[in-house]
């Protein structure tokens, strides 16, 4: 029985030149898309470009040990047959990766040696072999490649993988340490869009943070003190 990678490739080629969308083969229904597979067949080379940029945060982001207003990022674009997939490497300071380290890693990546973007396992194994670290840079290539293949197929990945998007696990929205007024505003901004909140603690206003959030919403709360709690009893009391 062919594996999913081979099935994806077979589905793509089987529908070339026909009036059937690959998404119909995968899911039995039409998925609106402005991207179409090259009807002359697939035989080009992938081209990867990347550039750094700075993501400006809406609010100051404060945890137990530091504050920041920006996050350094590197965007990765993989182009194939006129279709482009996008990925991103985000480098918060505690992960030890920088724009420079990501750029240096990406300069080593040569995707032009691959003529078939559907060879996901081979391509990503090659990327992983270039360094034992550099996980943010590798993730950016991984995301861009999957985005590219999804666009070539004209289907979202939950359809390609046969997943029910209604069963997607809930993710959290993080609220950084701040004054009561700002915490209240942050909570109101996200309370109707997320099912769980993650709250940064680890300073003198921990209880005030929780009380302020509880004055706005009763959503479940997960807490992250970022090594800010040094006393066991204090942690137990919280």
Predicted regions and their residues:
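Metal- or metallocofactor-binding catalytic centers and their adjacent structured scaffolds
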Residues: 42-45, 50, 66, 78-79, ...
């Amino acid at each position: 029985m062919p594996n999913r990678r081979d099935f994806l490739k077979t589905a793509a080629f089987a529908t070339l030149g026909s009036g059937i969308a690959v998404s119909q083969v995968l899911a039995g229904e039409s998925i609106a898309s402005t991207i179409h597979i090259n009807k002359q067949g697939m035989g080009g080379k992938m081209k990867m470009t990347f550039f750094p940029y700075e993501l400006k945060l809406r609010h100051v982001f404060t945890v137990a040990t530091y504050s920041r207003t920006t996050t350094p990022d590197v965007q990765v674009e993989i182009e194939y047959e006129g279709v482009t997939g996008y990925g991103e490497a985000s480098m918060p300071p505690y992960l030890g990766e920088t724009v420079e380290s990501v750029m240096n890693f990406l300069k080593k990546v040569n995707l032009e040696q691959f003529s078939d973007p559907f060879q996901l396992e081979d391509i990503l194994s090659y990327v992983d072999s270039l360094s034992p670290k550099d996980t943010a840079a590798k993730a950016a290539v991984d995301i861009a490649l999957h985005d590219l293949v999804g666009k070539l197929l004209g289907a979202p990945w939950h359809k390609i993988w046969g997943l029910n998007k209604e069963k997607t696990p809930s993710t959290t929205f993080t609220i950084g340490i701040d004054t009561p007024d700002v915490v209240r505003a942050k909570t109101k901004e996200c309370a109707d869009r997320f099912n769980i909140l993650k709250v940064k603690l680890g300073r003198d206003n921990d209880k005030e943070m929780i009380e302020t959030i509880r004055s706005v919403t009763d959503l479940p709360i997960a807490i992250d003190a970022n090594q800010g709690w040094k006393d066991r009893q204090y942690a137990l009391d919280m």
